């Protein structure tokens, strides 16, 4: 009933408002167009057009069919290529989780553009998570690949890892903060007087990692790195920031880097993906990262020197 040729004919008549104009568009005779529409109406059991001597207009049923017909036709026309992609081992959906530390909107857009060009029928879902929330998505929420899991060893033997690099940290505060000019190293008693600005671990099942905070110290939780940086610049509180994100602000004296009794060690991050069952799209993403291709360079800027 709704074969591609019939749908094309119906759409052409609906858009042109004329059997003859639809015939010209489709390189058919007017009689052929009229016959196909008549047959479609007989098969559906409803009138799809109001006919006058000069034009045809859609009935309510015709309007409803038109609202669906374009999508149906597009689906039917793309199905052979879509089936070929599935037959070639390409996933129908790929879920990618990205560590908040590596999340870069431009890098995400560049990766999606590259993937969408090669896999036009694959659905891509991007999630942004914090600390152990990245592993959580892989282990418990069916994600295919993670950009920036914590550590260099997998939490389950069903995953492969490729170390990406280590994030270096600086303890910072606003340039006009009361502790900015106090003799180093700053003591815990001095630090405890001011709020720690942190981003909360987004893990739902795994144990959350606790960010830097002294016992009895006030903590301010913000949703992302952009807000955390803004809070430090505004003098709201103190805490650690990735060196690559704050060094320019230290250099131009917007922020001050200080030494405290317990400095944060570098944080190694890795690419992680399932060892078994991965399709071509995931394999291609892994290749982009293992070969350090330009398409993914934006994700690695935070390391300075990848694999460090």
Curated annotation (Swiss-Prot):
Induction: Induced anaerobically and by nitrogen limitation. Repressed by AllR. Residues 19-38 bind DNA. The lineage of its organism: Bacteria, Pseudomonadati, Pseudomonadota, Gammaproteobacteria, Enterobacterales. Keywords: Activator, DNA-binding, Transcription, Transcription regulation. One of its GO terms (molecular function) is sequence-specific DNA binding. GO terms for biological process: positive regulation of DNA-templated transcription; regulation of DNA-templated transcription. Signal peptide: none annotated. Residues 2-59 form the HTH lysR-type domain. InterPro entries: LTTR, LysR_subst-bd, Tscrpt_reg_HTH_LysR, WH-like_DNA-bd_sf, WH_DNA-bd_sf. Positive regulator essential for the expression of allD operon. Binds to the allD promoter. Pfam families: HTH_1, LysR_substrate. It comes from the Bacteria. Belongs to the LysR transcriptional regulatory family. PROSITE patterns: HTH_LYSR (PS50931). This is HTH-type transcriptional activator AllS. Transmembrane segments: none annotated. The keyword Transcription applies. The gene is allS. The keyword DNA-binding applies.
């Amino acid at each position: 009933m709704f074969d591609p040729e019939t749908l094309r004919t119906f759409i052409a008549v609906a858009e042109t408002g004329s059997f003859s104009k639809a015939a010209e568009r489709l390189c058919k005779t007017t009689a052929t167009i009229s016959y196909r529409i008549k047959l479609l109406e007989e098969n559906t059991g409803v009138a799809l057009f109001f006919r006058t001597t000069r034009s045809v207009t859609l009935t309510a049923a015709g309007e409803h069919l038109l609202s669906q017909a374009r999508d149906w036709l597009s689906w039917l026309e793309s199905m052979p290529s879509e089936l070929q992609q599935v037959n070639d081992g390409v996933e129908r959906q790929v879920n990618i989780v990205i560590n908040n530390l590596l999340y870069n909107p431009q890098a995400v857009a560049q990766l999606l553009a590259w993937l969408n060009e090669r896999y036009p029928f694959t659905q891509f879902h991007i999630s942004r998570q914090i600390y152990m929330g990245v592993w959580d998505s892989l282990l418990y929420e069916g994600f295919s690949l993670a950009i920036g899991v914590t550590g260099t060893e997998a939490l389950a033997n069903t995953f492969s890892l490729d170390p990406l690099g280590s994030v270096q940290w600086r303890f910072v505060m606003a340039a006009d903060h009361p502790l900015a000019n106090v003799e180093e190293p700053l003591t815990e008693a001095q630090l405890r007087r001011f709020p720690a600005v942190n981003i909360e671990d987004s893990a739902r099942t795994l144990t959350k990692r606790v960010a830097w905070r002294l016992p009895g110290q006030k903590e301010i939780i913000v949703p992302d790195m952009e807000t955390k940086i803004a809070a430090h610049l505004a003098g709201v509180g103190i805490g650690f920031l990735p060196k690559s994100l704050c060094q320019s602000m230290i250099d131009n004296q917007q922020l001050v880097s200080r030494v405290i009794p317990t400095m944060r060690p570098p944080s190694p991050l890795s690419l992680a993906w399932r060892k078994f069952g991965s399709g071509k799209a995931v394999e291609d993403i892994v290749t982009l990262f293992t070969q350090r291709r330009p398409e993914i360079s934006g994700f690695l800027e935070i390391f300075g020197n990848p694999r460090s």
